[in-house]
Amino acid sequence: MSIRKQYDTDLESLKNSLTEMGRNSADAVENALEALCVADADAAAAIVKGDARINNMERDIEHRCMTLLLRQQPVAGDLRRISTAMKVVTDIERIGDHAADIAEIIPHLVTVRKEGDPAVSQAIVMGKKAHQMILDALDALTAENENAARRVIAADDEVDYDFNAIKHQLAQEIAEDPGKVDAALDLLMVIKYLERIGDHAVNVAEWVQFVRTGRYKDESMF
């Protein structure tokens, strides 16, 4: 195999690994939402345990990116793709971390909030929107689709709106019954992690724009 063919193969393998890692993180978020919905502490524990695999994938991808940069000294589009992989792998790993963070809270919520709790139900709706943002960001990354990336960025406004609405509702809960403060704070942390997940999806989308244009947040890079 020629050097160029091997290089192209390595780039494609890197792209596939990044996609696989992204799907694992997205699945972790989906599983966390399902565990939250049915108050399943055992499922939550499995999500926390599974985060180690996502962390290992991050380290592997970072190593492969550095190897390609040092051995091949890529330019133009290939350099942007590898640089983007090194950036988005961090966001994807953080998405997995936040899924595990949510899972760690679930056993506490089980004891203080009943199934069908309105605030929990609203948090799940918010979470589904954030989860869809992840899927759409990953699709945009795979296809290098700038228009799809823009739609992901625009979708974050709705997740932010939900976060603020639920936060206000939880504040009202505490005002009406200070004894509910622990239950409210636990759920506040859940929605904060979901809001951050949406932010990480936006970050991925912004790096898709960089791949296509060489500009990141309206600043020219290379």
Predicted regions and their residues:
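Cytosolic, long alpha-helical scaffolding segments
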Residues: M1-F222
